[in-house]
Amino acid sequence: MCVLKSRRKGFSFKGGSMMCRNYYLIPASKSYVYAANKQYLTDDGILTKAWDYMDFIDKHTAWGKKRSVNTAMRKRAGFISKDEYGNEVELGYKSEIIGVTLKDNPDVVRGKKANLILFEEAGSCKELAAAWQIARPSVEIDGVAFAPMIAFGTGGDEDSNFATLKDMFYNPEGYNCLGLPNIWDETPTDKECGFFCP
């Protein structure tokens, strides 16, 4: 799905909640969020919001989970125990939320089977076109999606970075995205577009 939006619409909160839903309710799930810069993930970014949700859920609800990995870019539900032979083994839910920065290298998305993939601040990501196509096999079998992949963002600071998100919006079928009737453009058209949040 391609989402073109204006600023301050809460999509980092929405994305964080989607990842937490998988983390707490789907064992061994993997939710990835990709961004061009680490600051879009951390600081006041989507992962920080997800971690705040997790801290609240762990403290105030019955769904709390221990974390076998607990870093600024990755959380994994689980714990280490010893088996009858004294070997350390990981037990628990084993669901994960993982943040990855593209850093001018769209190949970092390759080979990651996922239950959810988000592209944060996609309008500022010059690697979006290549990364999207490379990531598609992570959520598709023979062109049929078994998990959602969502790119959302606003126009970037540089026109060239926004070009791919704009193309995805006006040509959703070319990216295997959900197409919706285009009721937003001044000139009526029967072509479909991505999701728009004014």
Give the positions of each predicted feature:
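Phosphate/NTP-binding elements of NTP-utilizing enzymes
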Residues: 1-198
